[in-house]
């Protein structure tokens, strides 16, 4: 009593305190960062290593395996995967959430250093690492185009100057430059000319390497001066290499341009990048794990004027893709939804109270509670994201509930003729315990979420804390500011025998009378209501089992990512044509705004594309509908497939797959994996629950096996090293020397001129100089035959791995897809030597599925414990929790009606319903118990009177919560995929709960009361007189 009086009778102090915490909230709002979702990035580090010309199997055994053994000893590694392709190895390390990325990076560098002695000596550089996840879509893509600069020159400028500058921006994890390679002097050898001159390829290599030397020469000095010695020991351009003498024949000099073409070109000619229909260099920028995407993009944009100033006029720099506009638009939509929710909730209060003054009180309580929450969010290190703003939107209905309960009870006393300050004090005193019970039991729902581990726990933590803080502040406001305003703003009124005869008042009276009549009938037919109650429990179980489930709603971020997979024996020239064909098909779609793509490098038969769609308001179709439409056209391209997927704000795992979900096959036997992977992939491709099936297991690449006749080689004076060196010099794009320039270092690349290596006959022109100086053709000591070979070798841990990626057809849920895969694996009878498991998002979905029921039961148990403590009873909490089955049925039926799968967002809705719908029962039970204690009423009379007396606040609080969530259901535009499941669940649950709990709660109350009396009689003992 004294606590409430302290604030009621000191209005100035109360107002100033409320104003102070509101100002703190406004300041917190201005300081809060903006993000699409809470930070849930796993710390990921990518290690790269290269050995030009090495086969995938060589890279896997000699480079990947030593690095994996060393990196696998690092503490906190959650998963390690590797992919080795032609001349390149990439290892992805995914760490636990609690691992600091910078500390992990130091351990990675130490592990690389430890493995260095085990790596091949011919590697041109040490392995490097980047603190970025290569499977994440770039947060921004910049393109460079020019009509006068070559692709190599553009690439050099981009990698030497732009990429270096961008990489230094806070939040940037990696800048991947694609579309070409660094400039180089390329030497294209003529095998026939070399044979005629008697010059071996190794002799050419050694001559070039010896002619381009960068060594210190020292200095000369006397008593007065000092002279630095400088020589012309370096060759920097093709023109300087052309007259280089590499051999003498019969006293005549054989120069390099006599036996080769020497050109200024690029290190790897098998690279191509495009933006729309124009050749381009791409700068793909990825953020560091656990950094804010909006802040990073803003920092890059702030740097763009400086970058533009660095760029020559002949180069055009454009932003081809930016993830931030759709994120900002989505957050703006949520903010508008929040504003609409506040307005609707206040409108509900006004319609019930029909008083401007009375409505002003909750109209003040709502913004004070919500705005003050921003201060707590800032102190907790949260961000303004879709989930935290959705929490505030839902909180609108909660925070007004407490104020409504207090206000309605005070209004009831005022209508009875009590003085305002007395009514405020007594009304607050009467419902204070009720309000505290409702708020604490609602906050208790979120305790299991706060204790939940893994990615789902981290994802939902901000939502739970934000909502809990808003409810806590609302509780304080409703017991301090609300009664104070009631006491000083509202006036006493004479008792009304027929109150509210107009509009909503008449409707409410009619509803209350109808409810009273129907409640009497229900209380006389309790068995029928009991059957209905038990039926809702059974229906909950059936609906939960039957409803399709997924991990997270499929988002439309306005960005698509595509992976090209062509025939494994395709040439680079043909692959570049496929890229152009696919880009044209996509560019012609009316919903597409921009297309960029690249191909080449170590994976000749693959490519990547990034597609920016028009803003949501300028297109009718969703991203998934656009993918479905394009899929039909893309399948008509012969010899290649383009797999499209919508970029999501949550991307789990480090695998760079061509679809949204992955299923990984592991085996310690590579032969077993190669035998079973095609069978499993074929069986999965026949499933209607899966689409876009593809695999990173590629072992049908064209290979030419050379079989050396070692006896003949020994007789001819040739060793294996010389033969292998010949092949590397001829066909490996071998980097034989380095050109040092002020801004960068460039390579001299040697190979047989492509004009002489267009078919297998090129091998017949190869020869080796033996120990006697004679030219021995390769065909003298080697035979060759075509065969199949892997284009890539993949590991997970230290096991051979193959990942099958898949998308979901429209109308199919992730649960249906995973069930179909598990069923197929069982039917195939896959041996124990081949193990299958879901990866990435599908793996987290499986883990979440296993814990969902446990989480719901934990929330119910927590609420029961809190209510049991508050009521000092084992029975009354059960009465209150009896409202939950009807809410669950309503939520699940609403999801089915809207064809929405049960996702993590829907789970949040169910958890919220556990907290919301019990409020009705709390108000009924509180007043019934008080009526029994102080009024001497029977349980039947007490619960009947409580139901009628609390009918108006029950309707007000339920409608307020319902209208607070309704904008989420009706919202469209960016980000609506996230908001709608939450709104659907809450509104559906509230509608069904309101229809049933007004009748089932009194019946359950009487059932437990009779049960209590029955047990008390059994336990009572007769008194014996002595």
UniProtKB/Swiss-Prot annotation:
Annotated membrane topology: Multi-pass membrane protein
Highest taxon of the lineage: Bacteria
Protein's UniProt keywords contain Cell membrane: yes
Pfam families: ACR_tran
Location(s) in or outside the cell: Cell inner membrane
Subunit structure as annotated in this protein's UniProt entry: Part of a tripartite efflux system composed of MdtA, MdtB and MdtC. MdtC forms a heteromultimer with MdtB.
Family classification: Belongs to the resistance-nodulation-cell division (RND) (TC 2.A.6) family. MdtC subfamily.
Protein name: Multidrug resistance protein MdtC
Naturally occurring in which organism (per UniProt): Salmonella arizonae (strain ATCC BAA-731 / CDC346-86 / RSK2980)
Gene: mdtC
